[in-house]
Amino acid sequence: FPAKGSLPTKIPAPNFSPDDFVVKLGISYAGEYSINFNSLPHMLIAGATGGGKIILSRWIIYQIVNKGAFTYLVDQKGYVDYRDLREDCRCLDTNEEILDGLKSVVDEIARRMELCRSAWISKISDYNVLPGVEPQPPIFVVIDEANCLLDTTGKSKVEKDFIAQVVQHLLTITRLGRAAHVHLICICQRSDVNSIPGALKANMEIRITSHCADKESSMTILGNGDAANLPKIPGRFLASDGTEFQAYDFTCPPGQNL
């Protein structure tokens, strides 16, 4: 394992974890750093431009789709960073598509919970191993530039009504999604009260950020000021569990979509 102060700054992406719920993120001082969406179902990734959050988010999407997850993707920048990854995601572009897509996810959570109730079990992962049933794949909703989608500052009443509906669907997903194997990943440049509602952020157990300009910015994401002391190294992140890690440097294989 790397000694303190000697994390590499460029680490090629490895093979996937064999475990369905486990996604590899990078290398920490204790070794490989992974997260398990079974126990920590929802994630917030924050960081300024150039911090490496797009490379990390692309690597996460690449893993979950290759593990068989049905992935909804929302990108307010027009998928510039996801051109090679979007073919196997359902991309939600217009406001109508976003609301319809999120509602379908909420409806799917309800359907899966009814399957569980009918089988006298509490979560869809237990349902999937029952004999004779059709396994229900994991579902991920990935929102890049979440602050652009959710910030109500300067918005019209119509726009605020749209945002309120989006937030309500996202809150439902984060409150009920775990047992249904439905997960939310939000990626943003900042995470203040205007860009990510506090109730939504509180439901996102995994929070990760690159270097923050000040302790106040770090506080809004992690609940402490530690990210202000993080080195300004592209791909260097601090997680809400206190782990500092260098994200894997991922490039989609040439000529290969997901």
Label for each model-derived stretch:
Residues G5-I121, P137-D214, L222, A227-P231, ...:
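P-loop NTPase catalytic phosphate-binding loop
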Residues Y33-I35, P131, T243-F245:
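Short beta-strand segments
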Residues S104, S125-V133:
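Conserved alpha-helical scaffold flanking the Walker A/P-loop in AAA+ ATPase domains
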Residues L230-L258:
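Conserved AAA+ ATPase small/helical "lid" subdomain
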